């Protein structure tokens, strides 16, 4: 069984606040979106690579019902997802 480590500082992290502000949601909601996405990634992106994963898939994985492009861009801008030089995406500091 896979597990996910969530640091106690997540709830007060500036990246969480930044993403929450961009999406116009409260920080606890943003934390839920992130944890849902990370739990999905354990099985569906185990290396952290998001190549071939669309913004719509990221949105569904996070259980976000807003604009998928906005969520993906927000996660990149806030630093939760890294965009490599070749345009592929990776979950920041995954494993």
Give residue ranges: language-model regions.
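Positively charged, structured surface patches that bind polyanionic biopolymers
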Residues: 1-86, 90-95
């Amino acid at each position: 069984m896979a597990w996910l480590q969530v640091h106690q500082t997540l709830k007060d992290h500036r990246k969480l606040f930044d993403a929450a502000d961009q999406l116009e949601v409260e920080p606890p909601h943003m934390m839920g979106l992130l944890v849902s996405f990370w739990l999905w990634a354990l099985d569906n992106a185990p290396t952290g690579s998001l190549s071939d994963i669309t913004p719509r898939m990221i949105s569904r994985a996070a259980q976000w019902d807003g604009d998928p492009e906005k969520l993906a861009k927000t996660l990149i801008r806030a630093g939760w997802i890294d965009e490599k030089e070749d345009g592929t995406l990776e979950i920041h500091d995954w494993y």
